[in-house]
Amino acid sequence: MVEKQIAARGIQDPRVLEAMGKVPRERFVSEHIAPLAYEDRPLSIDEGQTISQPFIVAVMAQQAQITPQDKVLEIGTGSGYSAAILSQLASHVYSMERYPKLAELAKKRLQEFGYNNVTVSVGDGSLGWEEFAPYEVIIVTAGGPQIPPSLLKQLAISGRLVIPVGPSLESQQLMRVMREDADHYRYENLGSVQFVPLVGKEGWQTTSSS
């Protein structure tokens, strides 16, 4: 999977490629869809959510430029697969999930497979996780109508935020935001994507958005 679906499509960061090769995606989906785990596409999980396609996980990780010293905030734990990838790249990953059922299952999987530098909690991801801020990296695996102000505030100086944003679920752009100093941010459009909605106080108000 790594060579054909990820490296061949432009992912060059050796640490990202190594992490993708180490994490068994089939362990993060239901048994009945495990045979599809290494296809490069999203797969359905509980609560109407999805596990992102491997290539998109790799793109977001590479664009975040994660170092071994970085503290990472992930918004949208989902199955725990992306958190497992990020845990191979960072010092610690704090992952916020809206759905308690998904959070508990992800926490169980991550602990079972030895990803001990991941902390999972339940809450409104659009508000971030202020307790452990600032973060060198914030990665958001759900798309909102705007970049949540709370996430910008919790980004460290020189930090990187990777987030899908758009006026509807059918029209999203993957954005990279770099915090240059206390008051200035630099924005870069990385291209079109499609993610589940970021629901919360600073995101969409419902799971269906038009």
UniProtKB/Swiss-Prot annotation:
EC number(s) per entry: 2.1.1.77
Main location: cytoplasm
Subcellular location: Cytoplasm
Pfam families: PCMT (PF01135)
Active site: 52
Annotated GO MF terms: protein-L-isoaspartate (D-aspartate) O-methyltransferase activity
Reaction catalysis annotation: [protein]-L-isoaspartate + S-adenosyl-L-methionine = [protein]-L-isoaspartate alpha-methyl ester + S-adenosyl-L-homocysteine
Gene Ontology CC terms: cytoplasm
Biological role stated in the UniProt entry: Catalyzes the methyl esterification of L-isoaspartyl residues in peptides and proteins that result from spontaneous decomposition of normal L-aspartyl and L-asparaginyl residues. It plays a role in the repair and/or degradation of damaged proteins.
HAMAP family: PIMT (MF_00090)
Name recorded for this polypeptide: Protein-L-isoaspartate O-methyltransferase
